[in-house]
Swiss-Prot record:
Belongs to the complex I subunit 2 family. It is an enzyme of class 7 (translocase). Changing residue 158 to T: In strain: MELLI1. Disulfide bonds: none annotated. This is NADH-ubiquinone oxidoreductase chain 2. The gene is ND2. It comes from Apis mellifera ligustica (Common honeybee). Its main location: mitochondrion.
């Protein structure tokens, strides 16, 4: 058990190191090699402590297909052929990256895999394993109007598509696919803001996943032990959904500010706001069920004075105060 934990944590450190090296390299071929090393480590991480090997096989198959095409495209790219300067070649390369990160229309494999993964695997798939190909895609290709059309279509489609699922894992899979637009577009506009976003996003996502993993929450039929545990879940969900007054909303707010300053992005901003409201509505549906269950089962809650879950109230209050304080500091002072 100790060896498994040691190997698991070292693989994560290797993956972080690969991502840092990629951000400090301008050579496309070196970035591709680092991405492939990251893929090997990612498959190992998905397999560790997992009895179900299907998600790793799916991810391996998708990675092999995209990597083979990317390898030949990189060779053509480095040969300086005039075809590589065209929008067609640019879009073909981007489609291979979209396949790897599971965006529309290649989203089915990711949503299907999330249902079979545990929470630790979902955290890795939604953060480190996703950031590496996104960074290389923005480094290698040009984010033009066709890319923006495709990304905004992905956001609108996923925000509607997520409404049909009744499992928490599939909803988080759709949420991860939806957030791909933010990662790609922010990286294109401002690299420093992208780094700040992935750190904040990973931290918030880690808190949410740790909570779900600790209490073994798998679907919408969960029941909380007390109201403080429920308040913690509500705070984590609002924070993850980038809801106003929470620190995570600052990233979305800054992106909106940058898009408003460029009039060419106004139509994208309008569609993004619509898709964002639809996605937040999907989160609110979860919270509505939590409130309904709270009212129905409130008599079954454990006595607050005698239970060991009292610390959740302090955690929720601290997290909420921290978010509001930083939100006010960064935007009004």
């Amino acid at each position: 058990m100790f060896f498994m934990n040691f190997k698991y944590h070292w693989f994560i450190y290797f993956l972080i190191t690969i991502f840092v090296l990629m951000m400090n390299s301008n050579n496309i071929f070196i970035q591709w090699m680092l991405m492939e090393f990251g893929t090997i480590i990612s498959i190992s991480l998905i397999n560790i402590k997992s009895t179900n090997k299907t998600p790793s096989l799916i991810y391996y198959s998708v990675s092999v297909i995209s990597s083979i095409f990317l390898f030949f495209m990189i060779i053509v790219y480095l040969s300086s052929i005039s075809f590589t300067k065209t929008d067609t070649f640019n879009f073909m390369v981007q489609m291979m990256f979209f396949l790897k990160i599971g965006t529309f229309p290649f989203h089915f494999w990711m949503i299907y895999s999330y249902e079979m993964m545990n929470w630790k695997q979902i955290f890795l798939m939604s953060t480190l394993i996703k950031f590496i190909p996104i960074y290389m895609m923005v480094s290698m290709t040009k984010i033009n109007s066709w890319t923006l059309y495709f990304l905004i279509t992905n956001s609108l489609y996923i925000s509607f598509y997520a409404n049909k699922f009744y499992t928490l894992k599939k909803l988080l899979a759709c949420s991860t696919i939806f957030n791909s637009f933010y990662f790609i577009f922010i990286l294109e506009l401002n690299k420093n803001m992208f780094i700040a976003m992935i750190i904040l996003y990973s931290f918030n996502y880690f808190l949410l996943i740790s909570f779900l993993n600790k209490f073994n929450i798998q679907n919408f039929n969960f029941m909380f032990y007390n109201k403080y545990q429920m308040y913690t879940f509500l705070t984590l969900m609002f924070n993850y959904s980038m809801y106003p007054i929470f620190l995570s909303f600052v990233i979305k707010w800054n992106l909106i500010f940058m898009m408003v300053s460029v009039k060419a992005y106004n139509w994208i901003l309008f569609l993004l706001m619509i898709s964002s409201m639809l996605m937040i509505w999907n989160y609110i549906i979860i919270l509505k069920r939590v409130f309904l269950k709270m009212n129905f089962y409130k008599n079954n809650f454990i006595d607050d004075k005698d239970n060991k879950y009292m610390y959740h109230s302090y955690f929720a209050l601290t997290l909420l105060s921290f978010n509001i304080s930083f939100f006010i500091t960064l935007n009004f002072l």
